[in-house]
């Protein structure tokens, strides 16, 4: 039985030779032939490429034999009925459909997206960029090709490019924007961001890293250590400018190209180790010739070259881990997982939640019922032969990505390393119980990847479904939709319960508010009554004080009055009769020589102060209080007797 690594190599060779792009179909055909590469190719090529195969004893059609350069003409023959025989095409060979390639081209602070068929040339890309950037083709250097510099006449198909590509434009003949002084230029560079395109030589992987101009070369090397696990002292660099002689130098003054600069990093190693690693990546595929010595035609006749035949196998050997071993911080581990997943399978993939599993629970379950979602946990395993198929064909399908984004929170973990596997099983046992943990623990490698669908409940988290990697897009979508139906039914109940609970809480809040308003109204009435009583008390006190003051004044005036003269007196006597507003009369005798003020004091001593009342005489009618109080009664003609009236002043 072929190992997992051998299977990936066989699968890559089988797809390259047959041109079958559907990985599910390729695996099915290989499994039918017990992973025998030659038998599988013999069984597929007649149907897929329109080539007839001779039967036992059948008459062979005259024609030239297939003579690959790798087999001499004197090679021993075989009588196998499955051997390749000279054939003539019975129908037209199916032509390869042109691929659509996506290019993102960066120039200074602009990004231009270009989509072309792989039958186009590099020059056609430049023509499009000339219209977009207004830069003549003759002044333009298009960089970023993995194979180095290419000619404008190079056909894209011959470069064997992936679907998504990143390029950048350099214009060395065009003057860059000038600054007023060197200090100003340096300050401007310190504020700029440099894109460093760093190629990891051993694994043939590119990292696009952004650094500010104030970052140092040492900081770049430390960041590269975090990504490649190559210590700074073991890093072997290519591409630094000659002026970058000190690791403490900032990028702005190191002479890097702006906006992007290409660098290459590798591990310092002996030539013998390098040769040994190269030899381990070489894979030979031997075909069996028939009894007549006919050989299998070269793979280039099928439209693929050696790089396409062995590229997938070499790529598999150079894979970077999805997660660092013994990952301490789940957020950092998932950042690396997302970056590596994108580099392998493209940018069209589910949005993986960056954070701990507990944080994913909070995001999915511990919100309002209307905002809750299902939690999908993707468990990756690099050693499973199904991983590449599941990720590229199913998990990255646009329909799956869209459905997951709308209805799920997607969290991922890599179980390839034993330490990471043990850590996830611990989390699984804590959150889902020992039964689910044991189920995952007993899964075989070839049953991965797994897709767990989790629904949050009031007291626990329920695993609705465990989807294994040997599925199809339609089946995966059906199982996701089935889980969504269960979740929707539960969500409707939760929404109803939540609405009822919120209604009860609203009623309680309204009652509490009404009670509070009632208490405030009672308190306001009580405070108003208290203020009224206090005001009445204050006014009463003022009134009493005024009465006491008036009484004191009255008594003092009464005591200050001269004694009333007798009727028979040697001096002239004036008798005054004063009518009060109530109709009563006040009578008293005064000496004719007494001043008018004494009359006023007498009236005031009876409770009628002269500043509040006025004295009026009848004949003639006059206001006595307007007369001079220092004149005598005789002078004001209130002698020998007079009747006066008291009247309140207005």
Curated annotation (Swiss-Prot):
> What Gene3D superfamilies has UniProt attached to this entry?
DNA helicase RuvA subunit, C-terminal domain (1.10.8.10), Glutaredoxin (3.40.30.10), Phosphatidylinositol 3-kinase Catalytic Subunit, Chain A, domain 1 (3.10.20.90)
Is Phosphoprotein included in the keywords of this UniProt record? yes
Residues where Phosphothreonine occurs?
580
| GO CC terms, sorted | CD95 death-inducing signaling complex; cytosol; endoplasmic reticulum; nuclear envelope; nucleoplasm; nucleus; ooplasm; perinuclear region of cytoplasm
Ranges annotated as spanning the membrane: none
Per UniProt, subcellular location reads as: Nucleus
Q: Please describe the quaternary structure of this protein.
A: Interacts with CDT1 and ATPase VCP/p97. Interacts (via UBA domain) with FAS (via death domain). Interacts (via UBA domain) with NLRP12 (via DAPIN/PYRIN domain).
- The protein, known as: FAS-associated factor 1
Q: Which organism is it from?
A: Homo sapiens (Human)
